A protein has these predicted regions:
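C-terminal motif of bacterial Sec signal peptides marking the signal peptidase cleavage site
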Residues: 3-6
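A sequence/structural signal for flexible, mid-protein segments enriched
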Residues: 8-159
Length: 159
């Protein structure tokens, strides 16, 4: 004798309202200039396509960074209007082929000042002003911890 049971019940979930927010994605690494991308958040349940993704990037912000001694305003550099010689670097950062950079208008905030690069032991303060609001953050580049005794062992019979 085989018995099968099943139930169906419609469940309605009340999803809270969506409020667009600013997303700030920044990094500074040892020996590299700071790079900041600013975009608008997207609703989780909205449809997504390339155009809606690309339209979410923000331009027109005022972005400053300080290392405790020097404060600079970062330059807005957009993919459709890059300074000569920077195309390969921008393509690598954005993950877009160099041949397609001009087709997109993605703006990043950085500096072409070679004296302002990430340094081990420094703490950096970021300030972003956009649409009448100011957002702040800080980060530090910590001293790297060296590996004491790296060993690679290959088990017999494994390739």
């Amino acid at each position: 004798m085989l018995l099968l049971f099943s139930c169906t019940k419609e469940v309605t979930i009340d999803i809270p309202g969506y409020e667009e927010q600013i997303v700030i994605d920044g990094r500074i690494e040892t020996g590299q200039p700071p790079i900041i991308l600013i975009s608008k958040s997207k609703e989780v349940y909205s449809s997504t396509d390339l155009n809606s993704f690309l339209s979410g990037f923000v331009s027109g912000a005022v972005v400053t960074i300080s290392d405790g001694t020097t404060t600079i305003q970062l330059d807005e550099i957009c993919s459709d209007n890059l300074p000569p010689g920077t195309e390969a670097l921008a393509a690598a950062i954005l993950g877009i082929p160099v041949s397609e950079l001009a087709n997109y208008n993605i703006c990043a905030y950085t500096t072409l000042n070679a004296s302002f690069i990430g340094t081990v032991g420094k703490t950096y303060q970021l300030s972003v002003s956009f649409n009448g609001k100011t957002y702040t953050a800080s980060t530090s580049i910590l001293t790297p911890t060296p590996l004491n005794n790296p060993i690679l062992r290959i088990s017999a019979g494994r390739s």
